[in-house]
Every structure is written in structure tokens, then in C-alpha cells.
């Protein structure tokens, strides 16, 4: 079977990704300045504080652009509403998902998406043995993987499906970070499921992607 013809991403996706990446860059820059502020001499503190204030204004402005951009495009707007239905998924995560992997047709299933993000588990091997703890592969999009960490922590408290999974893993004696990794993967399955099926999250209706 011949592979399908390559088609460029829609302009609205490329523009959204640029806006999201710009926010990420400015947030990182602001954090660097905040770190400097803690150790800088008094003579430069005012300048750093002014720069932090400027960066905050820029970040807020671009975030507003992102919201408006999504609202201006029906497909993005509809996907945003679906993602908002998942407990633990907030605005920052939604923006990142829509910008980087909102098109589920690129991935055959949620496991493929997990591998793309670098959160699929793998066994650590020693010589010819594959015994050992399962850990995240750490191969994939580092920024996307980091962006799923905090939502997973929130979901461990408020998302009924992930809370139940956490309880079972805890009772089985699994370590905390393994449970967090499992929560991140489950979040990806939920995200993939609602987008693929075009149905909002419903804990009482277990889709096969959950």
C-alpha cells in the first residue's frame, strides 16, 4: 500500500503552535529573571522587576491571542470544549494539545500517541535480563511530557477514572512516581478518546480508548 500524500498542516494549527511556543519561551524567560532576582544586588533589582512585569504583560497578551484564535476556528473551538470536559485538563494543557497533537488521525491509537510524547513505559535491562522497574521511555517531546505532569497530579485527586487507577496501583504496592507516570498515560488515553470519538468525557460511559 502506498503511503498517503503529504499534506501541510492547516494554517490555524501552525499559527497556534507558534503562539503556544512563544508563551512557553516567555514563561521560561520570566522564571530565569525571577531566579536572578533572588540573588542579585539591589542596584539591578529594579530593572529585573520591571522586566518581569513586562514579560508578564506579554504573556497575558499572547494568552488572550490564543483564546481568540481558538474561538475564531470552529474545529479548534469544538475540540477545546471536548478537552474541557476532562477533570484535570486546564487551559494550558488544552492549548498545548491543540497546537501539537490535536489531530488524532496522525496516531493509530493512544499508545502511539504516548510513545510520541515519550511517556510509554519500558523495561530497564541488565545484560540479557529485562527484569527491573518499568519507567517512562524519556524519548519524545520533553516540553509536552513536562506539560502533562501537573495535570496528572490534579487528575490523581479529581478525575474518577484516574483516582480509581491510583487506588488499585497503591494497593498493589507500586511506587509513587510509577503511579504518576501511569496517570500521565491515562490522561493521554482520555484526551485521545474524547477527540477521536468526538464525545465529552463521561466516567460512567467507558469508551474503549479510556
Over which residues does each language-model region extend?
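Long, charge-rich intrinsically disordered scaffolds of nucleic-acid metabolism proteins
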Residues: 1-82
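Short, mixed-charge aromatic SLiMs
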Residues: 17-25, 57, 118-124, 170-177, ...
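Short, amphipathic alpha-helical segments that act as regulatory/interfacial helices
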Residues: 20-23, 27-30, 34, 38, ...
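Conserved hydrophobic/aromatic pocket- or pore-lining residues that grip, position, or stack substrates
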Residues: 55, 62, 89-90, 113
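N-terminal alpha-helical segment
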Residues: 62, 75-79, 90-94, 161-162
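Phosphate-backbone recognition surface of nucleic-acid-processing proteins
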Residues: 84-85, 91, 95-172, 176
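Low-complexity, acidic/Ser/Thr- and charged residue-rich accessory regions of DNA metabolism proteins
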Residues: 128-132, 156, 162-210
